[in-house]
Curated annotation (Swiss-Prot):
Organism for this UniProt entry: Novosphingobium aromaticivorans (strain ATCC 700278 / DSM 12444 / CCUG 56034 / CIP 105152 / NBRC 16084 / F199)
Keyword ATP-binding tagged: yes
Organism taxonomic ancestry: Bacteria, Pseudomonadati, Pseudomonadota, Alphaproteobacteria, Sphingomonadales
Spans annotated as Disordered: 606-635
Gene3D superfamilies in UniProt: 1.20.1270.10, 3.30.420.40, Actin, Chain A, domain 4, Substrate Binding Domain Of DNAk, Chain A, domain 1
Induction or repression: By stress conditions e.g. heat shock.
InterPro entries per the UniProt record, alphabetical: ATPase_NBD, Chaperone_DnaK, Heat_shock_70_CS, HSP70_C_sf, HSP70_peptide-bd_sf, Hsp_70_fam
Record PTM Phosphothreonine, positions in chain: 198
Keyword Phosphoprotein: yes
Protein name, entry field: Chaperone protein DnaK
Protein family per UniProt: Belongs to the heat shock protein 70 family.
Length: 635
């Protein structure tokens, strides 16, 4: 049976592992390295380079060397984060035909999924060279805070690379698998994953082979690339102040700065000071003569820590939210597992130690542990690893828009996946023959404040009064975190469904903004939801009372009928005003009048039934019961 491999498709570096004799083994690539740079380049001769060969020629070929493409995967071109990236990278980011962010290299446009697929192909070939057989199946990891579009695009990349992606799993969860496979005692751990382009924090309970994710949070645009950028801008600003020339406008110089910044950042994890020496970084034209300029700068660890202090602090807010969602305090965490190359930075470790109040666990290789966890999950799926159960979660709430523009959540964030949930809704108007199902992702109370993932129509509903048709909406999130939504008319059996496509995915900025907005405007959201609910309640009551009055007006005396009509008019005026208190007050007043009408109808029926020789037809009893049911339903 062919082996299933585990791949950590990283922003900066990628890694592949396989189960070998019951333990995960990281496989060295053709250059003898255990990790491969996630870089793809196209030479002037049309040759495609992947990994270290691509990285080596980046300085001389910046336009056609693509790096950190994971930050673009599943992202729209118009996304603010995409636009930010266009200013930071030497290659060209273009707008794809579907509105997604693509890249231009070697005279062609490529989707981020295609570029990622080239790296995955390298991982596939690395595994095949080691195993001596063809590899067709893989488990691929993604940041825990990746949205549906990004997960789908990652799965597409695997398919382009010739791999059947058996499972997409979250990077912190994979790291926990590798960390806790041999641990039987129950523990609550935090996985702090600061990689090349993304940050994740996950809280898990592990023990007896069960790995249960309690909560997850993160920032999909925060990682080592941002640390490099901070150093690049620091060096460029220093050079501009000294020489009066902006190196950021020169693609070749920018690429050299980036390489030097990354190298300095790494060196300062073990040294207190480093010198950046870039001879002939640019030249000045003076009086027809060219004067070469050199960049020589000493950077200390303290300098670096000052430059990136804000970035490190940004990781703590998701940590606080993850702990709150899990319902535990930092003191209750038994172990903190560090994942991602940036966690080698002493300042990062110091901040993590201060936040959680304990020394972080450093017994795993932060660059390799995710791939090892992916290999373990591959072993589970293949049947080679027994007695391991992985319970992951979805990072954001999912729901649909209902009457009044309310976001009705079907699946809350941090719900264990795979999961499936159904709810029955009805029509908002009489004789409505079609409904539009609008699917949203986010934490805000009103649908318009969340991200629209997609929409579809369910048509052919038989004409009926509002509230009569039964439309069952089902949300289904698979083990990969990919969403399917369906709607079914229970009366006719007609069904329509949608799989959210990558082109409709959320941006990193959208997700972060949703959560921030939800906290910042919590009170405003509650008021808007309360207003929508008050309006829905009042309109529903008006509709029901008008219908009852129309059908039973002859059984109510003129005085009460006039009172009810006046109460209906006042309720309508309150609805038009949009005032919550007024709508609730007038709805209550109308409810009282409707109850009086129901009582009057009942007494009239009782009197008729009690009169000599009178018979109370069963049908009339049924009608009265139905009327009571209707009034009760709309209180």
């Amino acid at each position: 049976m062919a082996k299933v491999i585990g791949i950590d498709l990283g922003t900066t570096n990628s890694c592949v592992a396989v189960m070998d004799g019951g333990t995960p083994k990281v496989i060295e690539n053709s250059e003898g390295a255990r990790t491969t740079p996630s870089i793809v380049a196209f030479t002037k001769d049309g040759e495609r380079l992947i990994g270290q060969p691509a990285k080596r020629q980046a300085v001389t070929n910046p336009d056609n060397t693509i790096f950190a493409v994971k930050r673009l995967i599943g992202r729209r071109f118009d996304d603010p984060m995409t636009q930010k990236d266009t200013e930071l990278v030497p290659y060209t980011i273009t707008k794809g035909k579907n509105g997604d962010a693509w890249v231009k290299a070697g005279g062609q446009d490529y989707s981020p999924s295609q570029i990622s697929a080239f790296t995955l192909q390298k991982m596939k070939e690395t595994a095949e060279a080691y195993l001596g057989e063809t590899v067709t199946q893989a488990v691929i990891t993604v940041p825990a805070y990746f949205n549906d579009a990004q997960r789908q695009a990652t799965k597409d990349a695997g398919q382009i690379a010739g791999l059947e992606v058996l499972r997409i799993i979250n990077e912190p969860t994979a790291a926990a698998l590798a960390y806790g496979l041999d641990k039987q005692d129950g523990k609550t751990i935090a996985v702090y994953d600061l990689g090349g382009g993304t940050f994740d924090i996950s809280i898990l309970e592990i023990g007896d082979g069960v790995f249960e994710v309690k909560s997850t949070n993160g920032d999909t645009f925060l990682g080592g690339e941002d640390f490099d950028t901070a150093v690049v801008e620091y060096l460029a600003d220093k050079f501009k102040a000294k020489e009066g020339m902006d190196l950021k406008t020169d693609k070749l110089a920018l690429q050299r700065l980036k390489e030097a910044a990354e190298k300095a950042k790494i060196e300062l994890s073990s040294a207190q000071t480093t010198e950046i020496n870039l001879p002939f970084i640019t030249a000045r034209m003076e009086g027809g003569a060219t004067t070469p300029l050199h960049l020589v700068e000493t950077v200390t660890r303290a300098d670096l820590e000052k430059l990136v202090a804000g970035l490190i602090q940004r990781t703590l807010d998701p940590c606080k939210k993850a702990l709150a969602d899990a319902g535990i305090s930092a003191k209750e965490i038994d172990d903190v597992v560090l994942v991602g190359g940036m966690t080698r930075m002493p300042k990062v470790r110091e901040v993590v130690k201060d936040f959680f109040g304990k020394e972080p666990h450093t017994g795993v290789n932060p660059d390799e542990v995710v791939a090892m966890g992916a290999a373990i999950q591959a072993g589970v799926l293949q049947g080679d690893v027994k007695d391991v159960l992985l319970l992951d979660v979805t990072p954001l709430s999912l729901g649909i828009e209902t009457l009044g523009g309310i976001m009705t959540k079907m699946i809350d964030r941090n719900t264990t996946i795979p999961t499936k949930k159904s709810q029955v809704y009805s029509t908002a108007e009489d004789n409505q023959q079609a409904v539009t199902i609008r699917v949203f992702q986010g934490e805000r109370e009103m649908a318009q404040d969340n991200k629209l993932l997609g929409q579809f129509d369910l048509v052919g509903i038989p004409p009926a009064r509002r509230g009569v048709p039964q439309i069952e909406v089902t949300f289904d999130i698979d083990a990969n975190g990919i969403v399917n939504v369906s709607a079914k008319d229970k009366g006719t059996g007609k069904e329509q469904q949608i799989r959210i496509q990558a082109s409709g995915g959320l941006s990193d900025a959208d997700i972060d903004q949703m959560v921030r907005d939800a906290e910042k405007f919590a009170e405003e959201d509650k008021k808007r939801r309360a207003a929508a609910e008050a309006k829905n309640n009042a309109e529903s009551l008006i509709h029901a009372t008008e219908r009852q009055l129309e059908e039973n007006g002859d059984k109510v005396d003129a005085g009460l009928k006039a009172e009810i009509e006046a109460a209906i008019a006042e309720a309508k005026t309150a609805v038009e005003s949009g005032d919550i208190d007024a709508m609730n007050a007038k709805a209550q007043a109308l409810t009282d009048k409707a109850m009086k009408m129901g009582q009057a109808i009942y007494e009239k029926e009782q009197a008729t039934a009690a009169s000599p020789g009178a018979e109370a037809p069963k049908a009339d009893d049924d009608v009265v019961d139905a009327e009571f049911s209707e009034v009760d339903e709309n209180k």
